[in-house]
Design a protein with these regions (language model features):
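Active-site pocket-lining segments that scaffold enzyme catalytic pockets across diverse folds
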Residues: 19-55
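Single conserved hydrophobic/aromatic residue that forms the stacking wall/gate
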Residues: 1-8, 13
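Short coil/turn connectors at secondary-structure junctions
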Residues: 52-56, 81-85, 106-110, 133-138, ...
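General beta-strand structural signal in soluble alpha/beta enzymes
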Residues: 59-60, 89, 112-113, 139-141, ...
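Short, highly selective alpha-helical patches that border small-molecule cofactor pockets
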Residues: 42, 46, 96, 100, ...
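Thiamine diphosphate
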Residues: 57, 64-161, 181, 183, 190-342
Length: 342
């Protein structure tokens, strides 16, 4: 194992090829058809990946049980055990990310770091350096919205997603279910020059019919309209994709033909061809609604001046998650109203 860590980029390429071979199997993309938090799905995927990538090494800022980033049977890295793969960074997020960058710069290791998404503010300077140096470090950032619930506004991210999305050369994935979470990990573990943030839910999310490996393109049609050019398009990410699909079903009964686009990663979507982007979001359809339980900053490029938003416009509050979504209007009913208003 020490030799694997010292040989640098050659072993990274060998492990990447092995990872791609395994990650392309049906087993990697197979999940139980039941509601599950994307942080929990992520933990299962991480442990699958460790079995084929011995050089996978990382940890959390004293939050591994909550962020689901402990690799079972991989041992804990310490002065007594250099062979351990789980690192206990303590509550020092900026140092954690700096160490992760250092491991990626060294070569031979594939590293990840983790904390609650709201604490990514402390990570930001090192995340920026990850992007600047084109290091494929993976940031596992959980508890991604007001879905955090009772911990209240100090622990509920609002503006953090827009901040990370604004960084050049940084892939920010907010998956809606298990399949999209697998796509996010696939990208994170196989790309060679882009840091990736996995922005994951605390609460259980349903598995969405229509979610697929197309998430690797950053954005795709998860529930299509019957018309080639729909009457309206609802664009969402993460936990709000299910709301968008529910709204589509209601609107179709009223005679409004709706397309739902899942947008787990804006940065990767922007790298697609103009033909692909036009096929997903035809310019001739100007009735668009963005749905996300975070700041709407950055959604304007897809919604435009004629569109509408079902997003957060304030900090959160302390209450059970379902009550918070109702309080702040992140509901199926409000998505339906937003489409009707256009």
């Amino acid at each position: 194992e020490m030799q694997r860590s010292l040989v640098g980029s050659e072993m990274c390429i060998r492990d990447r090829n092995l990872a791609e071979k395994v990650l392309d199997t049906e087993e990697f993309w197979a999940f139980d058809n039941k509601p599950e938090a994307t942080r929990s799905v992520s933990g299962k995927i991480l442990n699958k990946a460790k079995k084929v990538m011995p050089n996978l090494m990382g940890g959390a800022a004293d939050l591994a049980p909550s962020t689901k980033t402990y690799m079972e049977g991989a041992g804990d890295f310490s002065a007594e055990n250099y062979a351990g793969s789980n690192m206990h960074f303590g509550v020092r997020e900026i140092a954690m990310a700096a160490i992760g960058n250092g491991m990626m710069l060294h070569g031979g290791l594939r590293s990840f770091v983790s904390t609650f998404f709201v604490f990514s503010d402390y990570v930001k300077p090192m995340a920026r350096l990850s992007a600047l140096m084109k290091l494929p470090l993976t940031y596992v950032l959980t508890h991604d919205s007001i879905g955090v619930g009772e911990d209240g506004p100090t622990h509920e991210p609002i503006e953090q997603l827009a901040m990370f999305r604004s960084m050049p050369g940084f892939a920010v994935y907010r998956p809606c279910d298990a399949t999209e979470t697998a796509a996010a990990w696939y990208y994170a573990l196989t790309n060679q020059d882009t840091p990736t943030a996995l922005v994951l839910s605390r609460q259980n999310l349903p598995q969405i019919d229509g979610s697929s490996k197309e998430a690797l393109k950053g954005g795709y049609v998860i529930a299509d309209s019957t018309k080639e050019i729909p009457d309206a398009i609802i664009i969402a990410s993460g936990s709000e994709v299910s709301l968008a699909v529910e709204a589509k079903e209601i609107l179709e009964k009223e005679g409004t033909d709706v397309r739902v686009v899942s947008m787990p990663c804006m940065d990767i979507f922007e790298q697609q061809s103009e033909e692909y982007k036009e096929a997903v979001l035809p310019k001739s359809c100007r009735k668009r609604v963005a749905v996300e339980a975070l700041s709407d900053f950055g959604w304007g490029r897809y919604v435009g001046l004629d569109g509408a938003y079902v997003t957060m416009h304030s900090f959160g509050a302390s209450a059970p998650a379902d009550k918070l979504f109702k309080k702040f209007g992140i509901t199926t009913e409000n998505v339906v109203k937003a489409v009707r208003s256009l």
